Design a protein with these regions (language model features):
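Mg2+/Mn2+-dependent nuclease catalytic core
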Residues: 92-192
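Metal-dependent nuclease catalytic cores that hydrolyze phosphodiester bonds in DNA/RNA
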Residues: 1-104
Length: 194
């Protein structure tokens, strides 16, 4: 289990460095203007990645809702295979939400005693594991859905390679995630006088 915040920060830094390497300073351009262009370019890369992720999530959601998709992307079948091989055939419900206990959430995919969240990436799936934030997120979801013993997993989707990888979070890590989440929720409530 890694720290998601560190991974995201590293990715953002890498995007800024790549932008700096691929955007030469224009003749007569001040350093301030060049840096502004570099930052703008790296933000655009992050925005595009987020939009791709939203689009991929939407296609997977539509598939699990039974919407006819004339040209089903190959990565959707990779997701279906990964889930079915791990959890077996289930009646899945997508984008289910809850609000109770002072917090709420929306789960990408839920079945009887299973909670799944999709994460899109362009990285090599063999090198990916779940992050600590995922432990807390899914532990909070299963409690919010009143399924305290639900199995929880992250499904990484690489649409460029048409691959998916399911990583189930061990029960011990989910218990730790729930403990940490409840402490953070109590802190938030106290800080905000709720």
């Amino acid at each position: 289990c890694a720290n998601k915040g560190e991974g995201l920060q590293r990715w953002l830094q890498e995007q800024a460095i790549l932008a700096a390497l691929t955007l030469p300073r224009l003749e007569g351009e001040s350093e301030e203007d060049w840096l502004s262009r570099v930052v703008s370019d790296s933000k655009e890369t992050a925005k595009s990645a987020a939009e791709r992720g939203t689009q991929i999530h939407g296609v997977i959601e539509a598939f699990y809702e039974g919407v006819y998709i004339p040209e089903l992307p190959t990565y959707v079948r990779a997701v279906e295979t990964a889930i079915n091989e791990h959890f077996g055939s289930q009646l899945w419900v997508s984008e289910k939400s809850f609000a109770r206990g002072g917090y709420g959430g929306k789960c990408d995919l839920i079945a009887k005693n299973c909670v799944i969240d999709f994460k899109t990436t362009e990285k090599d799936l063999d090198k990916l594991d779940y992050y600590f934030d995922h432990q807390m997120q899914l532990a909070a979801y299963r409690q919010g859905f009143e399924m305290p013993t639900a199995r929880c997993a992250i499904v990484y989707v690489n649409a460029l390679q048409n691959k998916a990888k399911l990583v189930e979070i061990p029960e011990d890590d989910l218990r730790i995630g729930w403990d940490c989440f409840t402490h953070l929720l109590a802190f938030y409530r106290a800080k905000n006088k709720l």
